[in-house]
């Protein structure tokens, strides 16, 4: 693709008009139009500004790639995952999970994953299926996987959740809250210390990070991706060790460590 085609593609991906892009760049929309038609090329200063506005590297604008890989927003159908979780929950008599599935679907109704048309419920269902695929079928863990974002993102309270106290406690630990007067780093330190004190919560958080790492390339800005990488490097070795030191989760720890660290390493090489 030419520079002009790259500019147009990046602009359209961010749902900007030429006028909106021009305003952010400090140029006329005619200038943006001429770049996209390849009549003129932006100078170096404008290329740098374009990269900032689109939150990409300069090379993403100037590189001419004749072939682009087709990518997927999802791998599995969320309704199929729901059926799998429900069927498994019935077979293992997982009462909390059966209640949590429908509650989570209703709570997240209408929500989408960042910068996509993927229903948000895909994310908690992914965590539940990931755990079940590793032969983790503890009722409270699967239920908490499904409900882990409803307090933080849906305005629900712990008391409203249709599950037992242990599941509510896992959801509480998974819910990130910045207390009044607390800076983000202090809040994160307190949050991860709480997770590390509970092996089940540590396991769920590692499942959560696995899914978020695999989707952040299209859901987050480069700045947020960098923050996600540094946060993972800082806090997840301890969580993974907690999971590994819990005999019933030892095998799962190997898989989680491999997925988290290999995915982070790929991003580091490409950033």
What are these regions (language model features)?
Residues 5-24:
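Short basic helix-loop element that most often maps to the first helix and adjoining turn
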Residues 26, 45-60:
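DNA major-groove recognition helix of helix-turn-helix/homeodomain DNA-binding modules
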Residues 17, 28-31, 43, 57:
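Short coil turns linking two alpha-helices in DNA-binding domains
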Residues 25-41, 63-66:
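Recognition helix of helix-turn-helix/homeodomain-like DNA-binding domains
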Residues 70-271:
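Active-site helical microenvironments for divalent-metal-assisted chemistry
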């Amino acid at each position: 693709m030419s520079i002009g085609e790259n500019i147009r593609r990046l602009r359209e991906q961010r749902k900007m008009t030429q006028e909106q892009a021009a305003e952010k760049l400090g140029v006329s929309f005619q200038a943006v139009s001429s770049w996209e038609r390849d009549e003129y090329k932006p100078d170096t200063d404008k290329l740098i500004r374009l990269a900032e506005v689109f939150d990409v590297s300069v090379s993403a604008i100037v590189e001419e790639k004749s072939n682009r890989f087709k990518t997927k927003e999802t791998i599995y159908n969320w309704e199929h995952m729901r059926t799998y979780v429900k069927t498994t929950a019935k077979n293992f008599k997982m009462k909390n999970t059966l209640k949590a599935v429908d509650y989570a679907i209703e709570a997240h109704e209408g929500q989408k994953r960042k910068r996509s048309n993927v229903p948000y419920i895909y994310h908690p269902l992914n965590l539940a299926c990931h755990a079940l695929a590793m032969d983790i079928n503890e009722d409270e863990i699967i239920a908490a996987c499904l409900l882990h974002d409803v307090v933080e993102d849906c305005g629900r309270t712990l008391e409203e959740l249709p599950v037992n106290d242990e599941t509510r406690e896992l959801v509480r630990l998974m819910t990130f809250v910045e207390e009044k007067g607390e800076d983000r780093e202090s809040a994160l330190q307190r949050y991860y210390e709480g997770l590390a004190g509970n092996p089940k919560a540590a396991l769920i958080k590692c499942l959560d990070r696995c899914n978020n790492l695999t989707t952040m390339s299209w859901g987050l800005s480069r700045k947020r991706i960098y923050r996600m990488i540094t946060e993972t490097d800082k806090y997840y070795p301890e969580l993974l060790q907690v999971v590994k030191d819990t005999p019933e989760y030892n095998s799962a720890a190997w898989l989680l460590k491999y997925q988290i660290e290999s995915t982070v390493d790929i991003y580091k090489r490409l950033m």
